[in-house]
A protein has these predicted regions:
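Conserved helicase ATPase core of P-loop NTP-dependent helicases/translocases
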Residues: 240-264
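Conserved Walker A/P-loop ATP-binding site and its immediately adjacent core
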Residues: 20-23, 27-61, 130, 222-227
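Walker A/P-loop
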Residues: 2-24
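Post-DEXD/H (motif II) to motif III coupling segment of the RecA-like Helicase ATP-binding lobe
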Residues: 117, 124-180
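Conserved RecA-like ASCE ATPase "motif II neighborhood" in helicase/translocase motors
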Residues: 78-119, 125-133
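Pre-Walker A (Motif I) flank of P-loop NTPase domains
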Residues: 2-7, 30-31, 213-216, 264
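Conserved interdomain linker/interface between the two RecA-like ATPase lobes of SF2 helicase motors
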Residues: 162-235
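Conserved helix-turn-beta segment of the N-terminal RecA-like "Helicase ATP-binding" lobe
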Residues: 41-77, 235-240
C-alpha cells in the first residue's frame, strides 16, 4: 500500500526465496518485472525458474491454462534502441547488479520506466550505491527486496519495511536444514594446511561415492591465483576428473553444465 517504501522479506538461504518471488509475480499479475540478482550464476538460475514457473506448476499451485512468462536476461550494458526494445517485449527481465551498472543513463531510465515492479533477490549483496540508483527510478512503484540478513555486503543496513520475517530457528524446527557432519582437520604447520584439507575432502568423497551417494566436492578460493594453487592439490585424482573454474575460464557455461551432468 506504500509505494515510497520497499517491502523487505527476510528468509534464510535455502528456504524458498526464488519460489516466493515467482508466487508474488504470478499472484500479483505483474505486467513487467525487473529482477535484480547479485551474480551471473544466480541470474541464470532465476531465469530458468521463471521460464517454467519452478515448483508452482509441479505442485499444482497454478492451473494448466496459466502461461509461462516471456523471460529475458541482461548480461551486459545496452547501447542500442533495438536491444532495449527487444528486452521490453518480456514479462520478466533478470539482471545482475554489475550488468545494470554498465547501462548508459538514457537506456537505464527507459528500462526502469517500462518496468512496473522491481524485485531484488539477495538484497544484502547489492551495494548501497547501486541500490540508490535503482531505487530512485522506482520511487512510485512497488519494490520487493528479499534478503537473509538486514545488512548489506558493504556494511550498510538494508532499508525498507519488513513485511515478513522467517526466523532461522523456525526454519530449523520445520526441517529446512539437515544436520551438518563436522570433520576436523588438524595441521599445525600452516603451509601444509591446504594439503591436509584436500586429503580429508578426497577421503570423504571416495567414502561417499563407495556408499552410492551422488556427491561432489567444491573447494572455493578468494582469488583466481589461490584457486589455481588449491586446484593442484586435487589435480592428481584423475579418476575424479577435477576441474578448475573461475571468471576467466573459456566456455565457462559449458564447464558448469558438465559439472551439473556429473562429468566431473
Amino acid at each position: 500500500s506504500d509505494n515510497t517504501t520497499a517491502a523487505t522479506i527476510v528468509m534464510p538461504t535455502g528456504t524458498g526465496k526464488t519460489e516466493t518471488i515467482l508466487s508474488i509475480v504470478v499472484a500479483g499479475h505483474f505486467k513487467r518485472t525487473l529482477v535484480i540478482v547479485p551474480s551471473d550464476a544466480l541470474r541464470e538460475q532465476t531465469k530458468n525458474k521463471f521460464v517454467q514457473l519452478g515448483l508452482l506448476r509441479e505442485l499444482g499451485l497454478i492451473t494448466d491454462i496459466t502461461l509461462n512468462p516471456i523471460v529475458a536476461t541482461i548480461k551486459h550494458g545496452v547501447d542500442e534502441h533495438e536491444h532495449l526494445d527487444e528486452l521490453l517485449k518480456s514479462n520478466v527481465i533478470v539482471a545482475s547488479a554489475s550488468a545494470l551498472a554498465k547501462f548508459k543513463s538514457e537506456y537505464f531510465v527507459k528500462l526502469t520506466e517500462a518496468c512496473t515492479h522491481l524485485v531484488v533477490d539477495e538484497a544484502h549483496h547489492i551495494t548501497a550505491a547501486t541500490w540508490v540508483r535503482v531505487k530512485s527510478q522506482f520511487k512510485d512503484k512497488s519494490v520487493f527486496q528479499f534478503t537473509a540478513t538486514p545488512f548489506r555486503s558493504d556494511g550498510s543496513r538494508v532499508e525498507g519495511k519488513i513485511i515478513f520475517n522467517y526466523p532461522l530457528k523456525k526454519a530449523q524446527d520445520e526441517g529446512y536444514f539437515k544436520p551438518i557432519e563436522f570433520h576436523p582437520v588438524r595441521e599445525f604447520v600452516e603451509e601444509q594446511s591446504d594439503h591436509a584439507i584436500a586429503e580429508k575432502a578426497i577421503e570423504l568423497l571416495r567414502a561417499d561415492l563407495a556408499a552410492g551417494l551422488d556427491h561432489i566436492v567444491m573447494a572455493r578460493a578468494s582469488t583466481i591465483k589461490r584457486a589455481k594453487d588449491i586446484f593442484k592439490l586435487y589435480a592428481n585424482e584423475e579418476d575424479l576428473k577435477p576441474v578448475l573454474i573461475n571468471s576467466k575460464v573459456k566456455k565457462k557455461a559449458d564447464v558448469l553444465q558438465a559439472i551439473r551432468n556429473r562429468e566431473h
